[in-house]
């Protein structure tokens, strides 16, 4: 570790302690060049998911956007806030577990659709109609016909 006083890279660790929560390691170090003592902290760097939008811009993953989208689609439907939050948490966990740190908004939308399809067909239809950009009643009719064939 580089000494903040003299810039030397030679140091020794005098003491190591783990935080009560177990998420941070604190190390007391001493520079072997100038004798200066300093503290460093070590923590796990969280991975951040990036979302590639339809227009190819990239933005940080925002679980709240999933929650808002599902809330709109499930308004006045028998879906609880806890279920909605769980869907968003599950999607984030899935992406991290699979190592998908760059993911398209379309893939996230598909993950939401799959969960809503299982949970509530009306909320699913509402979500799909907005996400897929239905323009008129024909889009709904075609979707419902294809949906009924799959059931």
Swiss-Prot record:
Gene: nrdR
Designated name of the protein: Transcriptional repressor NrdR
Signal sequence, renumbered to the chain: none
Gene Ontology MF, one: DNA binding
Biological source species: Sulfurihydrogenibium sp. (strain YO3AOP1)
HAMAP family the record matches: NrdR
PANTHER family membership: TRANSCRIPTIONAL REPRESSOR NRDR
InterPro entries reported for this sequence: ATP-cone_dom (IPR005144), NrdR-like_N (IPR055173), RNR_NrdR-like (IPR003796)
GO biological process entries: negative regulation of DNA-templated transcription
Family of this protein: Belongs to the NrdR family.
């Amino acid at each position: 570790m580089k000494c903040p006083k003299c810039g030397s890279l030679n140091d020794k660790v005098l003491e190591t302690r783990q935080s009560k929560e177990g998420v941070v390691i604190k190390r007391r170090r001493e520079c072997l060049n100038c004798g200066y003592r300093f503290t460093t902290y070590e923590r796990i760097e969280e991975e951040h998911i990036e979302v590639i939008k339809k227009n190819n811009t990239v933005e940080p993953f925002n679980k709240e956007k999933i929650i808002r989208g599902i809330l709109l689609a499930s308004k006045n439907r028998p879906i609880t806030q806890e279920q909605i939050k769980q869907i968003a948490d599950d999607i984030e966990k899935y992406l991290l577990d699979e190592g998908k740190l760059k993911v398209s908004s379309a893939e996230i939308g598909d993950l939401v659709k799959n969960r809503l399809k299982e949970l509530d067909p009306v909320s699913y239809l509402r979500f799909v109609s907005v996400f897929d950009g239905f323009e008129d009643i024909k889009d709904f009719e075609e979707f419902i016909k294809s949906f009924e064939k799959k059931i």
